[in-house]
Amino acid sequence: LVADSRNVALNHTAGLSTPQQVQMVLFALFNLMDSRQSYKKAVKSVVRERDAALYRQLGVEVPQDPNAVDYYTLVNLENTSRKLYGDAFADWVMKNKNPTELLFRVADETGVVLLPGSGFGVQHPSARASLANLNEFQYAAIGTSLRKFAEEAYLEYKKASKKNK
């Protein structure tokens, strides 16, 4: 039995909750039968490899959060800028870069649309990527695009810093 959770959720919002209830029962029964949790471990491994591919290309360590469910990863450009080039650069990014610029940039370069990291309508340079839907190479491409964005911003920052001296 294969069913895409998004289709199940769509059916649920259309008022057809019985299919969702049946699917959840099947998931629960499968989990009880898989006493070694091998399926869950395999899925977690795939998701974590995707996350690692993104951050490896970005050039920073994968954030460690013991409470994370790892379904999404949140890339905060302010924190990433700080890790890559220091506090002064991160402050400059917050004052001078359009918060949505990185979302459009990644979409243009990779064909992948990321969601705003801090919620819709919040002006903060961050992005949220689902780790459930793409192939590992696509997450690496996202990381590469974000790193390129940071490098270009750093060159702008250095140029602006020289002018101000």
Residue spans of the language-model regions?
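PLP-dependent class I/II
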Residues: 1-165
